[in-house]
Amino acid sequence: MPAVKVKENEPFDVALRRFKRSCEKAGVLAEVRSREFYEKPTAERKRKAAAAVKRHAKKVQREQRRSVRLY
């Protein structure tokens, strides 16, 4: 859990912004969202495999776009 020490004479909204940023960097909200409902191990593997296929296709497409230039 991220912790933020409030500096002297620091406005509350600035400290809150720093806390939100540290939570986002630590991935707290993403973790909470992923654990909100139970996901069967097979469903999790299937989702991760689909994400890997999508990432690979995106990478291949990016590489093809780069190599098309013939000038």
From Swiss-Prot:
Keywords, sorted A to Z: Ribonucleoprotein, Ribosomal protein
Keyword check for Nucleotide-binding: no
Record has Ribonucleoprotein as a keyword: yes
Composition skew (Basic residues), residue ranges: 49-59
Transmembrane portions of the chain: none
InterPro entries: Ribosomal_bS21, Ribosomal_bS21_CS, Ribosomal_bS21_sf
Compositionally biased intervals (Basic and acidic residues): 60-71
Region feature Disordered, mapped onto this chain: 49-71
Gene3D superfamilies: Ribosomal protein S8
Any one of the GO BP annotations: translation
MF term (GO), any: structural constituent of ribosome
Gene Ontology CC annotation, any one: ribosome
PANTHER family, alphabetized: MITOCHONDRIAL 28S RIBOSOMAL PROTEIN S21, SMALL RIBOSOMAL SUBUNIT PROTEIN BS21
The family this protein is said to belong to: Belongs to the bacterial ribosomal protein bS21 family.
HAMAP family xref list: Ribosomal_bS21
Name this polypeptide is given: Small ribosomal subunit protein bS21
Protein source organism: Stutzerimonas stutzeri (strain A1501) (Pseudomonas stutzeri)
